[in-house]
UniProtKB/Swiss-Prot annotation:
Protein name: Holo-[acyl-carrier-protein] synthase
Essential cofactor(s): Mg(2+)
Similarity section: Belongs to the P-Pant transferase superfamily. AcpS family.
GO-annotated biological processes: fatty acid biosynthetic process
Binding residues for Mg(2+): D9, E58
Keyword annotations of the record: Cytoplasm, Fatty acid biosynthesis, Fatty acid metabolism, Lipid biosynthesis, Lipid metabolism, Magnesium, Metal-binding, Transferase
Compartments (UniProt record): Cytoplasm
Gene transcribed to yield this protein: acpS
Organism: Chlamydia abortus (strain DSM 27085 / S26/3)
Length: 122
């Protein structure tokens, strides 16, 4: 496998907290899949994990070279913690159209920021 592209993103957790407070479930349903919501909302403070996934989706979209839009939407990028590290799930059509075989992702957060780095492989 070879690296096709990389993508990074950083976001203030307070932005996600404010968006959830203002738009509540509508915002969650627009950005996050049901599985992502179930995982994050079980936490005492879900905002850091939601922000990390938001940054992850942005980083993945950048690594795919598409951004969020016509080819890849917010919920097309699903970030789940299957083992100890997050895994990226995309619709098969995205892999085929872009010639990508896999996307690796690292996400992290501190008290104020969430960050992510994605590597798209061909």
């Amino acid at each position: 496998m070879q690296i096709a592209h990389i993508g990074t993103d950083i976001i203030e957790i307070s932005r996600i907290r404010k968006a959830i407070k203002t738009h509540n479930q509508r915002m969650l349903n627009k950005i996050f899949t049901k599985k992502e919501q179930v995982y994050c909302l079980r936490l005492i403070d879900p905002c850091p994990s939601l922000a990390a996934r938001f940054a992850g989706k942005e980083a993945v979209a950048k690594a795919l070279g598409t951004g969020i839009g016509k080819i890849v939407g917010w919920k097309d990028i699903e970030i789940l913690k299957i083992s100890k590290q997050p895994e990226v799930f995309l619709p098969e059509r995205v892999y085929q159209k872009l010639g990508i075989s896999k996307v690796l992702l690292s996400i992290s957060h501190s008290r104020e920021y969430a960050t992510a780095m994605a590597i798209a492989l061909i």
